[in-house]
Amino acid sequence: MHTLDSLDAESRRTDVPEFWPGDTLKVHVRVVEGNRQRIQVFQGVVIRRQGGGVRETFTVRKVSFGVGVERTFPLHSPIVSRVEVVTRGDVRRAKLYYLRQLRGKAAKIKEKREPVGR
């Protein structure tokens, strides 16, 4: 069992910022097309975090041209090159599945205001 724990610790990333459901993220994803590789940015609201350790995943939702798009990313995957927190959201749930039914201003998440000294 200790061998698996040490392998998990080696493959975990340390450059991932803290974020929670409700936060708006920019996820920089490596996309391989043939023999070329490029970075694609996916910006949206985190609607869930699931799992723990190396197997942890998070789901980001955005509305593109009136169509809701959700992508689930493994947190410690080499496919995710970078994660940036754009804004912090103030929500009371860990899973924000209710955002799927909301449209327009109703789907807007209140921004978390932090004290100036922090």
Swiss-Prot record:
Entry-linked InterPro entries: Ribosomal_bL19, Ribosomal_bL19_CS, Ribosomal_bL19_sf, Translation_prot_SH3-like_sf
Pfam family, one: Ribosomal_L19
Residues forming coiled coils: none
Gene Ontology MF terms in the entry: structural constituent of ribosome
GO BP: translation
Entry keyword annotation includes Hydrolase: no
Alphabetical list of NCBIfam families matching this protein: rplS_bact
Name of the protein described by the UniProt record: Large ribosomal subunit protein bL19
